[in-house]
């Protein structure tokens, strides 16, 4: 089955439909201070994704959310309002995992280095990451949040969230031929009408207040289960990348 990337393109073809968090609810304003809203410019046009703050100068998201120009909004609840909690920062660098495969959507993870550090407060604050190779048991209840649209004609401007359960790997293996249990997580009970959908790509899967996953892809119908990038499998790359670019910037600083 051809997987559906869950980013939301602004320039959609006639008849295409984009969706929001399915079966969810509006989040309590500013209760998720790590959430990032990404406005992306690429050769294919404009799109938007989610992401999450992992350090004062880095946001983690999906590699398929790459663009030549990315504007990041943090501290937002309603993305169409000028909230005094919001911080708008451009991405200095978009660093995709070197083994990201656009065809199979393997290693769908990317770091955005911000052009300046965020001002940390109760509305903007990094989220905790898991330990290396830390797993999740099937049945674990987690939460996904995002700003995906409802339809072509009506959208949601406020952050929404939904609770989803981790599934056994075989649920995704039977649907998605390229699913890799070592680097991906199968999420969402097919018996429930709850899921992430277009526009939610790059957002975090929070389990016990730890960002274990990144929204990656699912079926075009929006019916679960869906595939999330397993953050714990990429911790060495995340840490090495953030450290190396910090050192590079120090070397480039003029005397």
Swiss-Prot record:
Description of activity control: Inhibited by soybean trypsin inhibitor, benzamidine, the synthetic peptide R13K, Z-Gly-Leu-Phe-CH2Cl, phenylmethylsulfonyl fluoride, 3,4-dichloroisocoumarin, DFP, SBTI and alpha-1-antitrypsin. Inhibited by LPS from P.aeruginosa but not by LPS from S.minnesota. Not inhibited by elastinal, CMK, TLCK, ETDA or leupeptin. (Microbial infection) Inhibited reversibly by S.aureus EapH1.
GO cellular component: azurophil granule lumen; collagen-containing extracellular matrix; cytoplasmic stress granule; cytosol; extracellular exosome; extracellular region; extracellular space; lysosome
Protein name as catalogued: Cathepsin G
Glycan-modified residues: 71
Gene from which the chain derives: CTSG
Propeptide: 19-20, 245-255
Metal-binding found in the keyword field: no
A single GO molecular function term of this UniProt record: caspase binding
Phenotype when changing residue 71 to A: No effect on proteolytic processing, enzyme activation or sorting to cytoplasmic granules
GO terms under biological process: angiotensin maturation; antibacterial humoral response; biofilm matrix disassembly; cellular response to lipopolysaccharide; cytokine-mediated signaling pathway; defense response to fungus; defense response to Gram-negative bacterium; defense response to Gram-positive bacterium
């Amino acid at each position: 089955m051809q997987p559906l990337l869950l980013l939301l393109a602004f320039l959609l073809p006639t008849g295409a439909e984009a969706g929001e968090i399915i079966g969810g609810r509006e989040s309590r304003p500013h209760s998720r201070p790590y959430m990032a809203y990404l406005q992306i410019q690429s050769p294919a046009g404009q799109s938007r994704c989610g992401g999450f703050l992992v350090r004062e100068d880095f946001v983690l998201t999906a590699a398929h959310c790459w663009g030549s120009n990315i504007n990041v909004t943090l501290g937002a609840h309603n993305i169409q309002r000028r909230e005094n909690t919001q911080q708008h920062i451009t991405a200095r660098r978009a660093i995709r995992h070197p083994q990201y495969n656009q065809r199979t959507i393997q290693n769908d993870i990317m770091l955005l280095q911000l052009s300046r550090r965020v001002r940390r407060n109760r509305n903007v604050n990094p989220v905790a990451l898991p330990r290396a190779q830390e797993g999740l048991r099937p049945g674990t209840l987690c939460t996904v949040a995002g700003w995906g649209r409802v339809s072509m004609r009506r959208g949601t401007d406020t952050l929404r969230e939904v609770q989803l359960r981790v599934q056994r790997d075989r649920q995704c293996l039977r649907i998605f031929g390229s699913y890799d249990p070592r680097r991906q997580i199968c999420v969402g009970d097919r018996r429930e009408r709850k899921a992430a959908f277009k526009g939610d790509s790059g957002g975090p899967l929070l389990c016990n207040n730890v960002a274990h996953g990144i929204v990656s892809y699912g079926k075009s119908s929006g019916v679960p289960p869906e595939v999330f990038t397993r953050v714990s499998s990429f911790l060495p790359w995340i840490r090495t990348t953030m450290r190396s670019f910090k050192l590079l910037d120090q070397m480039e600083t003029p005397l």
